[in-house]
Amino acid sequence: MSVLVVGMSHQSAPVALLEKLSMDETVQNDTCRAMVSAGSLSEAMIISTCNRLEVYTVTNSFHSGVQDVVHNLAEVSGVEEEKLRSYLYVRYADAAAEHLMMVTSGLDSMVVGEQQIIGQVRTAYQFASEQGTVGPRIHALAQSALRTGKRVHSETEIDEAGSSMVSFAFDQALSRMGREDLAGKRVLILGAGAMASLAATHAGRLGAHLIIANRTIARAERVAQHAHEAGVYADVIDFSERAQALRDVDVAISATGAQGFTITAADVERYHVADRELMLVDLSLPRDIDDAVAEAEGVDLINIERLNNSLQAADTDLAAGTSPHAQARRIVSEELESYASEQRVRDVVPAVSALRKRAANLVQCEVARMEQKHPELDERQMGDINRALKRVADKLLHEPTVRAKQLAANSGTVSHETALQELFGLQLEGSGVAVDMAELPDAAQMEAAENTKEEKDA
């Protein structure tokens, strides 16, 4: 039995499809119960946000488990299974655990380091627990993931990563525009999520006049209201008017993750005024703005992929492994190793229990046989024999029981011969040679030694 995650996010699927799979609490609970009623699934937890839909289950069969999850998602969303499969990703066993830890830490978010996802994972766990679809494996994974997320946010500065990206985008844009601020400039913001809100805040601080557009106008109005409260002038326009707005703005920033482009080359060709400089900034993955827009005269484009490359190239902390992102990845690795070790030990417990139960049954059988064969033995004598046999069985099994858990905790694999020696602490003459892998020469050392030998032979 292993943990399986089947899901999609802003990185793998268009927003329109994510919206079809989005689940409220009732649908989430019903779907969890439907999942565990499938023959291959025994536990289920669903994380549903505006940028992500992920189903965490425990399965006894990888392929059947994936099929059952996809079938249930198709039933709930009304989207054909074949279409779902083209956007879904699958992680299994330790890879599934690592994925949830990355998600909970904010390392897989559109705005890296955002903390809201911790609460969303906790809520998903609570919903599933209340429905009785959480068992020991998802419980252990959820607790490990939540602990990982807390560590990442308390021990690193990953919280600032998203704002750093937006800040860097503005630095790059201002540098190309030859300006120090945006005073007197009009900035179009497309989107109303975390990244778009950060962009609006930053543009406002630089003195820009904001124009906000979002598919849901109420969300655009909330962003504008926050700007007003900060003393920044902001208008709201209908999302369908975004292309026309290119006539009057100096900068357009898109952070929607929408299906298809929010700004196309045709939009720029039709509405951009040739003698007016236009800076376009794409903060979305997948991309919001068509790369072809940069071919138009007077138009410049910055996108998040180029920003990431430039930011990493300039980040000496990242190169040294001391950046918040690198530190966060190390924490995830530590927690994953701890979780995986605990799970391997937990997996061996049933076998150890079965071994002890078998030994106890053998003791009982031998005591019964002795009692039948020697009726002259009184109750005290039979008690002594029973206790003696139990002590022998306990002592014989103690070392292999302890060593079995130690071997399970170690992720390395061992041969059957080595396993027997390790379990029972056996020292067999001539059975093998103990080798410390750390003492073996690496490929470069072996090649150097071979070259030296050839020189001597020559």
UniProtKB/Swiss-Prot annotation:
The pathway it acts in is: Porphyrin-containing compound metabolism; protoporphyrin-IX biosynthesis; 5-aminolevulinate from L-glutamyl-tRNA(Glu): step 1/2
Q: Which processes are annotated in GO (biological process)?
A: protoporphyrinogen IX biosynthetic process from glutamate
Designated name of the protein: Glutamyl-tRNA reductase
What the protein does? Answer: Catalyzes the NADPH-dependent reduction of glutamyl-tRNA(Glu) to glutamate 1-semialdehyde (GSA).
Instruction: Indicate which residues the UniProt annotation says bind substrate.
Output: 49-52, 109, 114-116, 120
What keywords are assigned to this protein?
NADP, Oxidoreductase, Porphyrin biosynthesis
Q: Molecular function terms in GO for this entry? A: glutamyl-tRNA reductase activity; NADP binding
Q: What is its EC number?
A: 1.2.1.70
Q: How does it assemble?
A: Homodimer.
Note in the entry: During catalysis, the active site Cys acts as a nucleophile attacking the alpha-carbonyl group of tRNA-bound glutamate with the formation of a thioester intermediate between enzyme and glutamate, and the concomitant release of tRNA(Glu). The thioester intermediate is finally reduced by direct hydride transfer from NADPH, to form the product GSA.
Q: Name the reaction it catalyses.
A: (S)-4-amino-5-oxopentanoate + tRNA(Glu) + NADP(+) = L-glutamyl-tRNA(Glu) + NADPH + H(+)
Question: What residues does the record give for site: Important for activity?
Answer: 99
Q: Which domain of life is it from?
A: Bacteria
Instruction: Decide whether keyword DNA damage is in the record.
Output: no
* Binding-site list for NADP(+): 191-196
Active-site residues (renumbered):
50
Q: What is known of its domains?
A: Possesses an unusual extended V-shaped dimeric structure with each monomer consisting of three distinct domains arranged along a curved 'spinal' alpha-helix. The N-terminal catalytic domain specifically recognizes the glutamate moiety of the substrate. The second domain is the NADPH-binding domain, and the third C-terminal domain is responsible for dimerization.
**Gene name of this polypeptide:** hemA
The entry sums up its family as follows: Belongs to the glutamyl-tRNA reductase family.
HAMAP family (UniProt xref): Glu_tRNA_reductase
